[in-house]
Amino acid sequence: MSERNLPGGEMSSLILDFFWLADCSGSMNGEKIQTLNYAIRQTIPDMRKEADDNPNASIMVRAVKFSDGAAWHVPTATAIEDFNWTDLTAGGVTAMGMALELVAGELRQFPTDTKRLPPVLVLLTDGQPTDDFKKGLDELLLTPWGKKAVRIAIAIGKDTDLDVLEQFTGNRELVLEAKNPQLLVKFIKWASTVVKNVSAPMVGDAAGGGIDVNTIPTAAADDDEIW
């Protein structure tokens, strides 16, 4: 575990694991996947600033992509200071359950120590699972860190299964409906900022613990409604 030299002596750094879970199915082709790629790239400077402002927590980022199957897009936990985003392309179906299983397998390897903050999982999708979503979710929630995780879902467009996403988040307020490109960018940027809340001293086991839902962005009067 990394340590940082701080004024007043050496102090162990807490680890905050951040996971993007991105739908790359065929229905995401075009503006949706382009906007997703753009928005995630835009989050990087703000997340780096948050890491600078909170030297007691190390933000480590991973990413999963899912379509016909699920695979690591960023397989190695990468410090936000070194993190870069490679654009995704779209095609295939929506193996959301497999994506959750992949993350569950990673969380299962985490030690149950006090040097880790609850992980943040951000799921982005525009459709419905085409595989066994419940199996994947059950595996995730059976892991101690999966149960403690702050789980946020961003529904892209009007065809997303909101009930499925609420099962993932455990909190309807953390299912964000992006009906246009402007809202998708706003929601992705907002989701990246929850690291500030999670790194606060008190975070409960419940999904969304410590997150101020009043800060979730809303649509502007001039936003398009095209999805």
Residues covered by each model-derived region:
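Acidic, low-complexity intrinsically disordered regions
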Residues: M1-W227
